[in-house]
Amino acid sequence: MAAELPPYTHVPGITPHPIRDPAGHAYGKAIPRCPKPTIADWQSCWPLKEGRTLFEAGYYWEAHETWELAWATAGRHGPIADLIKGLIKLAAAGVKLYENQPIGVERHARRAADLFDIARQELGDTALGYSIPALIGIANDTAIKPPERSALPPGTPAPLLSLAKAHA
């Protein structure tokens, strides 16, 4: 499913909730299912690719929600689900950047690093199009020294975090 980027990125308590609020950018939109992601055929699970696109553009809440679809389809448990949950946690750290909550950024980024490490123990160094050691590094760097929060108006996406170094 290829999607246009939303007109804003959701910041809880500030912008309209994308799904629940009639003014939300995804209100009333049907969400297609995706096949269960596997190591061999992960690209057929559209939320994995779309989540990456949203994340790279600074739409962290939307990436989080999109990756949750893949996580649920993956069964919520096991190494593939752990890797996806790590991506979800890293996106949550991005949301906390927008909310100016440094403790939340650190907590979510550290949990992401832990989940990536757990996944790497079973999946090896590369899975779902990512270098898992690079993901661990990105998450740890975010926890230790988060990027400066953008001075843009709330809801304006800013790519403060990037997964580019982890693309495999």
Predicted segment positions?
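Residue-level recognition of tetratricopeptide repeat
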Residues: 52, 87, 92-94
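Residues that mark the junctions of alpha-helical repeat units in TPR/alpha-solenoid scaffolds
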Residues: 43-44, 78-85
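N-terminal alpha-helical interaction modules that lie
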Residues: 1-75, 118-168
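Short acidic alpha-helical/loop segments enriched in Asp/Glu that coordinate divalent cations
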Residues: 64-67, 80-83, 103
